[in-house]
């Protein structure tokens, strides 16, 4: 994806995220600064629906970024010395072309709320898209209590 296309998409996305919170659009230049603001805004966005138009732009951006960064397959993961049916991966979990990943999430299942924090929760929630936090919130509301340690939920992967 061309740098100009990424910047245009990010500008649209950041503008909408700022507007929904009554924030002024940040005085930023270039992809890197826009990306930092985008990450901070989505990392701290409450789980809520957003327009299909915004989701389309977000999905276009995220799928393009993931493709640019390179996707790793199961064959790139090491076979466990204890069980040949288990593969071990060390690296960016958002770059795996697999059917599922496991996140040691917090008991609210809503990810990290620290803007721009480089943790696995933020990586997964950023690259999956804002749909993931909304789905997790809906699952937790239906469940009516926090997720116990050692339990799991299956969600959509969205852009992952």
Predicted regions and their residues:
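Macrodomain-like recognition of ADP-ribose-binding/processing modules
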Residues: 1-160
């Amino acid at each position: 994806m061309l740098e100009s296309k990424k910047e245009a998409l990010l500008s649209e996305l950041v503008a909408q995220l700022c507007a929904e919170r009554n924030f002024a659009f940040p005085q930023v230049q270039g992809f890197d600064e826009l990306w930092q603001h985008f990450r901070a805004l989505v990392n701290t966005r409450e789980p809520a629906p957003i327009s299909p138009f915004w989701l389309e732009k977000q999905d276009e951006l995220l799928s393009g970024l993931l493709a640019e960064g390179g996707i790793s397959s199961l064959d790139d993961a090491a076979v466990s010395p204890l069980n040949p049916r288990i593969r071990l991966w060390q690296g960016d979990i958002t770059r795996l072309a697999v059917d599922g990943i496991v996140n040691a999430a917090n008991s609210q299942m809503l990810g990290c709320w620290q803007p721009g924090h480089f943790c696995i929760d933020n990586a997964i929630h950023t690259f999956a898209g804002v749909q993931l936090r909304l789905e997790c919130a809906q699952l937790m509301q239906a469940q009516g209590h926090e997720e116990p340690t050692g339990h799991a939920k299956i969600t959509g992967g969205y852009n992952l």
